[in-house]
């Protein structure tokens, strides 16, 4: 699973005890939280001994009474004992993200800062293609070695 930072929130699916949940990837959350309205009624929960900070005022905070089996978005095996409260969407915290092997990467630019300035001055818009309609190639293509030594510059 991968998600590029954009206007859209990074959400992914997880299967907990055989039930599918969708949640927001939240690297700032220590623990995962399931929305109270999505928590199955027959799954045991208990009043939480600790409160939740950073999600506003949560009057009712519970925690699963059991450690639950979980499959991540790419079927990563994990376990979780989530918190449960009234929030609009589920949050996948670092307790699960670490087990899933989640990474945050910021790739190095494909082009040097100088070439980026030149391209921008000539009207290039990052993420768009080259050309009048901005529909040209969006990523550089790889030069391939001609092992057979045929074609331009080589006798046939």
UniProtKB/Swiss-Prot annotation:
Reaction it catalyzes: Processing at the authentic HIV-1 PR recognition site and release of the mature p17 matrix and the p24 capsid protein, as a result of the cleavage of the -SQNY-|-PIVQ- cleavage site
Molecular-function annotations in GO: aspartic-type endopeptidase activity; nucleic acid binding
Active site as annotated: 26
Highest taxon of source? Eukaryota
- What Enzyme Commission number(s) apply to this enzyme? 3.4.23.50
Which leading EC class covers this enzyme? Answer: hydrolase
Looking at the record, the residues that make up the G-patch domain are 111-156
PTM note: Autoproteolytically processed at the N-terminus. Expected C-terminal autoprocessing not detected. The sequence shown is that of the processed Pro protein.
Q: Where is the Peptidase A2 domain?
A: 21-96
Q: What are the coiled-coil residue ranges?
A: none
According to its UniProt entry, one GO biological process term is: proteolysis
Write the record's keywords in alphabetical order, separated by commas: Aspartyl protease, Autocatalytic cleavage, ERV, Hydrolase, Protease, Transposable element
Family (UniProt): Belongs to the peptidase A2 family. HERV class-II K(HML-2) subfamily.
> Quaternary arrangement and interactors, per the entry?
Active as a homodimer.
Its biological purpose is as follows: Retroviral proteases have roles in the processing of the primary translation products and the maturation of the viral particle. Endogenous Pro proteins may have kept, lost or modified their original function during evolution.
What is the protein's given name? Endogenous retrovirus group K member 9 Pro protein
């Amino acid at each position: 699973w991968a998600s590029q930072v954009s206007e859209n929130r990074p959400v992914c699916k997880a299967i907990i005890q055989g039930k599918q949940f969708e949640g927001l990837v939240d690297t700032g959350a220590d623990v995962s939280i399931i929305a109270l309205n999505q928590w199955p009624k027959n799954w045991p929960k208990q009043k939480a001994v600790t409160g939740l900070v950073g999600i506003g005022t949560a009057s009712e905070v519970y925690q699963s009474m059991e450690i639950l089996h979980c499959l991540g978005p790419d079927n990563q095996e994990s376990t979780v004992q989530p918190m449960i409260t009234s929030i609009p969407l589920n949050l996948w915290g670092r307790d699960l993200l670490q087990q899933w092997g989640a990474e945050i990467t910021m790739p190095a630019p494909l082009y040097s800062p100088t070439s980026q300035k030149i391209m921008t001055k000539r009207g290039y818009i990052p993420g768009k293609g080259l050309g009048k309609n901005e529909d040209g190639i969006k990523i550089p293509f790889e030069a391939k070695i001609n092992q057979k030594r045929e074609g331009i510059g080589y006798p046939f």
